[in-house]
């Protein structure tokens, strides 16, 4: 699962076990090396600076944990460009924080938006670690991906009706738009038939 350390967590008097990914713990040699020499740490700090500048309030612990889980979840994956896949959710989170200026929950969800569909992590892992708000947004983004990739829904009006009926939180749509925006910004790395 990529989960690294366990810790007890008390919430409202109810004890529950939370599994937290730790930076460096379950990561590959390349990622540990990049963290050790500050490459990913610099990206995390850059994201936090953007969040502090553009968001009303920032739960830095939430963003750090989402960053760590996303990095761990995508540690072996590469994009068509050859760069680490993790840079995609990172860039989506930057769009959400800088260009849309949503909130820290949305930034965390943006970092995690591909975790459920592309890795061994499940929605229950995200819910246990980050709570219902983040998990619900990630779940909505995953469902929207399924709709966009469906060949049955072809017309814009059908998309609109279907999406609006499924989405209770507009942040789901905005994160999905940020996801598509970053994908369009990096289209040159795909073969023409995939563009």
Show the residue positions of the predicted features.
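Active-site helical microenvironments for divalent-metal-assisted chemistry
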Residues: 2, 9-10, 15-195
